[in-house]
Amino acid sequence: MKKFELEIRHPQHLSEQDAEALGLFERTEILSQFDAINWRRQLVSQLEMNGAITSFTVTDADTQQCLRLSLNAYSASDQLAFKLESDIEIVTPQKNLFGLITLKHKDYVAFKQLSLDQAKAYLNHFLNGQLDTLKDNYKSIREKQKQA
């Protein structure tokens, strides 16, 4: 079974170094930890502490790839909103100079304004090693943004 390092930062942790490094867990244990967090309560704490951050960081023990889900306290909607950041690299060709030259652009998988269900689904993809699914979703969102 694959193992993952888990680090949780609550609003009362003033700096990134204060986050709780909880150790190595299997996939199901990580999902249980994610479900056990009262995200609404974390949101209220974040707002009370003005600028505090709640994050859930998972690192693959083998590849050292990392995925961080952060709760966005200042979302425009009433629903919980998450931001996903990762070090999952994507290299995309980018046409330049009247379409004659193709350059490669390096980017990292990241999403904003994710619902709780979307955040959990992306976490599940990461834990299952389905990085191509994350990359494809990121690319499709980027394409939609370019067309808009």
Where are these regions (language model features)?
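Ampiphathic alpha-helical segments that act as solvent-exposed interaction surfaces
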Residues: E26-L31, I101-Y138
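Low-complexity, flexible helical/coil segments
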Residues: L43-S45, V91-N96, A121-H125, K146-A148
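Intrinsically disordered, low-complexity regulatory segments enriched in Ser/Thr/Pro
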Residues: M1-A21, Q65-L114
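Negatively charged, low-complexity tracts enriched in Asp/Glu with abundant Ser/Thr
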Residues: K2-C66
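Short, highly charged C-terminal tails/helix-capping segments
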Residues: K135-A148
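Short, surface-exposed, polar/charged, turn-prone segments marking secondary-structure boundaries
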Residues: Q33-I37, K83-D87, K139-I141
